[in-house]
Amino acid sequence: MGWIGKLLNGGDEKNKPAPVTAAAAPEATLQPATITEIDAMYYRWLAAAGSAQAPAETEQQILDELARLVREPIAGAALVPRIPAIIPQLMRTLQDENMSAAKLSAQLAQDVLLVAEVYREANRPCYQSRYNASPSINNMEGAIMLLGQNGMRMLLARVAFRPIVSMQSGGLTVRTAPLIWRQSEKCALAASLVAPTMHANAFDSYLAGLMANVGLVVAFRLIDQMHGPDVFPQSDAFIAQVFAQARILSVRIAELWEFPQSVTRAIGQVGVDANADADPQAQALALGERLSKLRMLADSGRFPADDPFVTTGLGKSELLAFGKLADDDE
């Protein structure tokens, strides 16, 4: 090739600039799992559902019955045990900032199971000093002083809801009710931990976390009674509707049980995904539900605790709360 050709072609091959290559595409940013996706995994894990899918007609019949209970919440409330009568009296005492440990001790003495629960809680390792091998708490006033006002409130709230898991029913309810209760306790704890950063009331958030799943317990009782022996209702659309209707039923039952309006409002406002404009109480509950369900799935071996499905979208404080939800040795 002559010099003119070389000039037109940019000179020798060795002097040619390297061909321009397309810039490498940035790695796709992981998006946090939606609560709908988490609910679907949680539901199928709860039920230990196989692959056999129930007919659409069966799913619709269950949803229709659940909708009826939403319209008639007294019937729905009849499917779960009532809160023990002594609990509201104790809660009223605990609302008093100047409560007397002696007065509360006298009220607690009316229920031997409550007395045992208070002693058990006060003697848990987490209440004992690392450097002080103190003797066990063996008097009620001492236990009350150790737990404090907020600790007593949370203890009584847990005790009030615990009968829900002792219901005798079909095999599915026997399996799911204790798991739902464990998740509810974790939800209540998580919601109370994140509440201050959202300017929400920690104790109301705790109550909302305990109450939010009562409707789901009722839903599983219906499913237990109505699904066929070899198939299970588990379509994505069905699961989404079960959680939506169960939430409304939880609100209706909470209203019947005269829960604070802030609690019923929070449960009702928690949507498919947390809304930044939602009531702070609802935001705390939504995050509590997310963290507690992910914790249950992680602890069951469904995911490692540090799996991106679990951790994506969680900030430092939320990861700290997630860590505190791990089961402890009592």
PLM-predicted stretches and their roles:
Residues 2-210, 217-225, 232-330:
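Conserved alpha-helical "signature site"
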